[in-house]
C-alpha cells in the first residue's frame, strides 16, 4: 500500500528526523521542502515567490513518485490549509492513501534548544520567542476527513515506531 504522508509541526519538533526514521523503516521517499527552498536562494526571488515555487516543486516531485507507486513523505510544517488540501488532492485518483503525522513538543525550552543547536539551512529559523511558540506550536492545519496521528517528539528515543508503522499500514486510518 502506497501512501502520501504529510509531516506537520513547529520547526524544531523533529519532523525531519522522524520522516527520515520512517523512510528507513518503510522505504518511503522523503521530500524536504526546506532543502528545495534553500537550493533556490541564489536566484533573487522574493520570499513569497520562493515559498510558492518550493511548494510547487515539492508537490510535483511527490506526484511523480506517487504515480510510480512509491510512498512519499512531505516534510513541511503544515501551517496553511491549502498545503494540506493539496496533499489530499494529490492522492485523488491514485492508489496512495493520505496520511498525516503531527510532531508535537509541548516544551518551548526543548524546541528552542533544538533550533539553536541544529545545523540549520539558511531558510530555516534558528530561534523563536516563547510567546510565538506557545501561540503556534499546536496550530498545524489538520485534514478534515482523515485520522491524523499526533506524536510527542519531546524525547526522540521514546517514539513508538510500531504505532507509527501500524498507522501507516492501516487503510482505515487514511483515505484516497
Describe each region flagged by the PLM.
Residues 4:
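Walker A (P-loop) ATP-phosphate-binding motif of ABC ATPase nucleotide-binding domains
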Residues 7:
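Hydrophobic anchor at the beta1->P-loop junction of P-loop NTPases
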Residues 11:
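The conserved Walker
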Residues 14:
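Conserved glycine(s) of the Walker
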Residues 17-68:
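Conserved substrate/cofactor phosphate-moiety recognition/catalytic segment
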Residues 53-94, 98:
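Glycine-rich phosphate-binding loop used to anchor ATP phosphates in small-molecule kinases
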Residues 94-115:
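Conserved phosphate-donor/acceptor-positioning beta-strand/loop module used by diverse small-molecule
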Residues 120-162, 176:
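Small-molecule kinase domains that catalyze NTP-dependent phosphoryl transfer to phosphate-bearing small molecules
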Amino acid at each position: 500500500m502506497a501512501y502520501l504522508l504529510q509531516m506537520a509541526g513547529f520547526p524544531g519538533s523533529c519532523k525531519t528526523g522522524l520522516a527520515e526514521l520512517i523512510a528507513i523503516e518503510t522505504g518511503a521517499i522523503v521530500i524536504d521542502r526546506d532543502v528545495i527552498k534553500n537550493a533556490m536562494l541564489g536566484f533573487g526571488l522574493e520570499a513569497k515567490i520562493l515559498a510558492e515555487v518550493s511548494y510547487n516543486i515539492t508537490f510535483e516531485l511527490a506526484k511523480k513518485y506517487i504515480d510510480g507507486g512509491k510512498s512519499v513523505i512531505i516534510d513541511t510544517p503544515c501551517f496553511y490549509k491549502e498545503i494540506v488540501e493539496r496533499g489530499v488532492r494529490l492522492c485523488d485518483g491514485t492508489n496512495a492513501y493520505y496520511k498525516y503525522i503531527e510532531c508535537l513538543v509541548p516544551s518551548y525550552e526543548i524546541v528552542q534548544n533544538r533550533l539553536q543547536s541544529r545545523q540549520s539551512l539558511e531558510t530555516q529559523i534558528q530561534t523563536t520567542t516563547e510567546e510565538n511558540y506557545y501561540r503556534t506550536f499546536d496550530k498545524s492545519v489538520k485534514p478534515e476527513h482523515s485520522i491524523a496521528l499526533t506524536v510527542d517528539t519531546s524525547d526522540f528515543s521514546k517514539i513508538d515506531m510500531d504505532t507509527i508503522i501500524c498507522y501507516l499500514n492501516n487503510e482505515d486510518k487514511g483515505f484516497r
